[in-house]
Amino acid sequence: MPKSALMSSSFQTSVSPRPLPVSCASRTAARKLSLYCSEGRTRCGMGQGKGWRWPGHRPPGLPSPTNRVGQSVPKWRPQPHKAAGGGRTIRDVKEAAFDVLDLGLLPYPQAWARQKQELARVAVGGRPTLLLVEHPAVLTLGRKAQEGENIVVTREYLAAQGIDVFAVERGGDVTYHGPGQLVAYAIFPVGRRVRDFLRLLENAVVTALGTLGLPDARPNPGYAGVYVDPREINGKTYDQKICSIGVAIKQNVALHGIGLNVCTNLDHFDLIVPCGLTDTQMTSVQREYDLRGLGSVSMEQAKKALTDAFALTFADYDWSLPGVAAGQEALSVASP
């Protein structure tokens, strides 16, 4: 593999050549993200979610998302790059202050090591990086996880399925990563602004999902992550979680990040109690498309929507490292 393929580039908003549509089933090695890629129409679904119904209910009293204290994020509609109410669009953001590197399909230990390399660089003033990656099937245990408590199968069964388990330093409980899930590791300076940073991550995902045609995406007060409208199944209402979030802060810089279910095999979430939440079901963009008659989604569409949303959400972010004493750390306790 050419060494240049692993190097990040400045996140520019100029139009790049249009690559062919790429589905979740077709992967390449680590590659630079091409913005304004063509909207792939190759089907991304894996047959999950048959027969579910969605009532279109939206719980009242949800707070408006903010990208800073007191600053409301513009409401978005499914049309890409168009903000309602005259809000700023991605084309107005000349250059983001972070790099974007697409690592393709990469085993979890290698991605974990890459995060730490990027952290060491950012901690001494290097340019922040957003790592995009998919993982082979794997379970990770956050700081809240008790050994095996929310894993509902034996380690022997997981080993037979080729699913590894790793204890990591992020906040939260157990979660699943696998093909069809877009994982974004935001190696950004944070310091003590952990809660504000988590809200910004949520806002970026909400904006991306709005661009993809899911305007009901929203945070869930009291829990980290992003949800769509709940569904009633067999007389019980279940929250529908589409994106998990869990971070750690070391040397004032964030590790880990988000896992957005694009066209994930949702059956694998049956191996665990996701994030330890018994009244929550995991969903995906493709499942929501199936239920709403929206066709199919590609991983490239999701990457484009998410990176555009990050550029907008973090356009006014304070990228300086806060004045925290050397060697001091803060670890978040975010639900994955």
Swiss-Prot record:
Enzyme class at the top of the EC tree: transferase
Keyword Transferase attributed: yes
Compositionally biased region (Polar residues): 1-16
Database matches in InterPro entries: aa-tRNA-synth_II/BPL/LPL, BPL_LPL_catalytic, Octanoyltransferase, Octanoyltransferase_CS
Catalysis performed (reactions): octanoyl-[ACP] + L-lysyl-[protein] = N(6)-octanoyl-L-lysyl-[protein] + holo-[ACP] + H(+)
BPL/LPL catalytic domain: residues covered: 124-318
Region LipB domain, residue ranges: 93-336
Region annotation Disordered: where it falls in the sequence: 1-22, 48-88
Residues involved in substrate binding: 170-177, 244-246, 257-259
Keyword Nucleus: no
Pathway as given in its UniProt record: Protein modification; protein lipoylation via endogenous pathway; protein N(6)-(lipoyl)lysine from octanoyl-[acyl-carrier-protein]: step 1/2
Residues annotated as the enzyme's active site: 275 (acyl-thioester intermediate)
CDD domains the UniProt entry points to: LipB (cd16444)
GO biological process: protein modification process
Alphabetically ordered keywords of this record: Acyltransferase, Cytoplasm, Transferase
Location in the cell: Cytoplasm
Transmembrane domains' residue ranges: none
NCBIfam families named among the record's database cross-references: lipB
Function field: Catalyzes the transfer of endogenously produced octanoic acid from octanoyl-acyl-carrier-protein onto the lipoyl domains of lipoate-dependent enzymes. Lipoyl-ACP can also act as a substrate although octanoyl-ACP is likely to be the physiological substrate.
Family designation: In the C-terminal section; belongs to the LipB family.
Protein name: Octanoyltransferase
Designated gene of the protein: lipB
